[in-house]
Amino acid sequence: MDDRLILMGVIGRPHGVRGAVHVTTYSPDPEGLAELPLRDERGRRVGLAWTGAGIARVTIGEGDEAAAIADRDAAAKLTNLRLYVRRADLPPPEDEDEFYFADLIGLHAVGPDGAALGTIRAVHDFGAGASIELSDGSLLPFTRAVVPEIDLPGGRAVVVRPVEVEMRE
């Protein structure tokens, strides 16, 4: 079972006076976020019910212990609350060439000749295209030209460093 927690969204500022909040999602399917078993940093179950684009009502807790956030003050206390889901609870990718960015973290990065380049430490996406960060601190564009092969079962990714990337020694 894969218990890694994947950040899926963040609760923002309150919306109105009845406990609704703005929610920033990191999911390609923001509506589907409400269907996932979300948890916060403390492990509490967080439920979302969308009321508009990026606006949701929130419940904290499970079963009989679940409490609906019903006023602006309670909603304000949730500002910046991070919403996670266990990797095992995410649906499998639909295509064999698809994967979650989280699955890349920890893969061994090897050159086309098989030489070890380190491991993938992080995947960043700041809006202009994803990039991978290697354990040596290199930040490379996550494109098919730079990462032509990903072997999840084998735990490795082939990385072709672009010519214009300076090498540090």
From Swiss-Prot:
InterPro entries: PRC_barrel-like_sf, PRC_RimM, RimM, RimM_N_sf, Transl_B-barrel_sf
Annotated domain remarks: The PRC barrel domain binds ribosomal protein uS19.
Similarity comment: Belongs to the RimM family.
Keywords: Chaperone, Cytoplasm, Ribosome biogenesis, rRNA processing
Assembly description: Binds ribosomal protein uS19.
Record's function text: An accessory protein needed during the final step in the assembly of 30S ribosomal subunit, possibly for assembly of the head region. Essential for efficient processing of 16S rRNA. May be needed both before and after RbfA during the maturation of 16S rRNA. It has affinity for free ribosomal 30S subunits but not for 70S ribosomes.
Organism for this UniProt entry: Acidiphilium cryptum (strain JF-5)
Pfam families per record: PRC_RimM
PANTHER family from the UniProt entry: RIBOSOME MATURATION FACTOR RIMM
GO cellular component: cytoplasm; ribosome
Gene Ontology MF, one: ribosome binding
Cellular location(s): Cytoplasm
Protein name listed in UniProt: Ribosome maturation factor RimM
Chief place of localization: cytoplasm
